[in-house]
């Protein structure tokens, strides 16, 4: 019996594309996959960002309301339609409140656990697991957000995941880049071969809300990923969101 895993990335709430996120949650409810993995940057948390240090945004007091938005728009709707395993990688944006406390308020570090994203978002209450930095998501595959492990980031789709695959020596699925792409590589000799795969799953962020782009259009692609697992057979698949819709197995979901 095959197993299906839905992998989503970089919602960066409150800068998520609300219609896309709602449609993907609906897809999960309709198809009931065996596992859901959010590969990181569930949250953006702009106020404690190093990019807003010294600006009015630093004093906006958004951490709590932004966390409540994530519960209202993602975690609660997801749990209303799906009771299977949900795991979340910690992305670089997710840990901004925790890092800010350590860097700028060391006298309060004893309270640091309260600023971890899993506590701000009540993962225990929603039955959500924090995944290890490198998670064995399927036979011969690991998932990781993509910002650690010495991975070199590039501006071309799939190339960052490809760099991770070569560095780690295993098939890899990542987020972080906001791009979609799949890129394999074959090693071997004398007709014997070993094929590894690298995959970047895209994002569910509203690019118009990314103020740091300053009106530019980034090389980002909206969508998510799927892994279909049957024993040691693993099929990676991208699901792009284009023209207000996406399709899986011949069925179409409207955004």
UniProtKB/Swiss-Prot annotation:
Entry-linked InterPro entries: Calcineurin-like_PHP_ApaH, Metallo-depent_PP-like
Cystine residue pairs: none
Highest taxon, organism lineage: Viruses
Coiled-coil regions listed in the entry: none
Stored Gene3D superfamilies: 3.60.21.10
Pfam families (alphabetical): Metallophos (PF00149)
GO MF assignments: hydrolase activity
Protein name according to UniProt: Gene 54 protein
